[in-house]
């Protein structure tokens, strides 16, 4: 590991050092001094001491990591850039991967936030082509309630209880419910999950399959059993039980069914 400056680049081949040296990218944060920060990493091959991957890391004047340049043992280079605001929040990022034969791939992401600094939109671009946009919605308590993907054509929704524990996740072909002091398990009032179930479509998409688990804990709140309650496979298939030693390590693990 290297810190404080970029003198380690001087011991590299000139061509490699030049390509790992920071070059400003328009629209992204500007490099500043890196005193006290990690500036480089060298990772050697386990089979050949002459082969290594080396990375240079760069920072802005607020100490935010804003760029990296990497050269690997295959002769490939990768470059990443970030634009950050004063608090260090990433507003946009860019990455380029260059192969040894001269090929390259670029990807970028732009992030939008609301007045409470919550992420509301991310736009992903691959080789200058927009490939996906994600939208994020929140409730009045700041909890994520909806995630829209694929430019808004698919989505997942989330529900919570009064304590802020997530209770439901619904996606296109998947639904999961988590129970704390309700459901089939022993009620838990400390945030531990007492049971859960999830629903998925059958292979031929003509039916909905329900699977589930009920959980039990010991007096130290360690998980001691997970009992399967699958409607398709029958009771206790994939059930697990745990025992612990005096130090809290798992001593025995039992699995049933399969």
Regions found by a protein language model. Give the residues of each.
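Short, compositionally biased serine/threonine- and acidic-rich segments at solvent-exposed termini, linkers
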Residues: 2-4
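Acidic/glycine-rich beta-solenoid
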Residues: 6-60, 65-258
């Amino acid at each position: 590991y290297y810190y404080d400056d970029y003198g380690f680049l001087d011991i590299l081949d000139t061509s490699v050092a030049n390509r790992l040296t920071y070059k400003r990218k328009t629209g992204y944060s500007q490099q500043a001094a890196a005193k006290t920060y990690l500036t480089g990493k060298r990772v050697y091959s386990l089979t050949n001491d002459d082969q290594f991957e080396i990375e240079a890391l760069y920072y802005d004047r607020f100490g935010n990591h804003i760029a990296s340049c990497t050269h690997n043992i295959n002769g490939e280079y990768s470059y990443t850039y970030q634009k950050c605001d004063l608090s260090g929040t990433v507003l946009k990022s860019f990455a380029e991967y260059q192969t040894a034969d001269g090929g390259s791939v670029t990807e970028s992401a732009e992030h939008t936030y609301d007045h409470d600094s919550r992420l509301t939109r991310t736009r992903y671009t691959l080789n200058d082509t927009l490939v996906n946009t994600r939208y994020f919605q929140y409730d009045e308590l700041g909890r994520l309630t909806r995630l829209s993907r694929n430019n808004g054509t698919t989505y997942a929704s989330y529900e919570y209880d009064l304590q802020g524990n997530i209770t439901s996740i619904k996606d296109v072909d998947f639904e999961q419910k988590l129970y704390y002091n309700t459901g089939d398990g022993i009620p838990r009032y400390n945030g531990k999950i007492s049971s859960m179930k999830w629903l998925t479509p059958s292979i031929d998409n003509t039916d909905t399959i329900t699977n589930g688990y009920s959980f039990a804990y010991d007096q130290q709140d360690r998980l001691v059993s997970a009992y399967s309650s699958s409607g398709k496979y029958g009771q206790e298939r994939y059930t697990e039980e745990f025992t612990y030693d005096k130090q809290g390590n798992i001593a025995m693990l039992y699995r049933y069914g399969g």
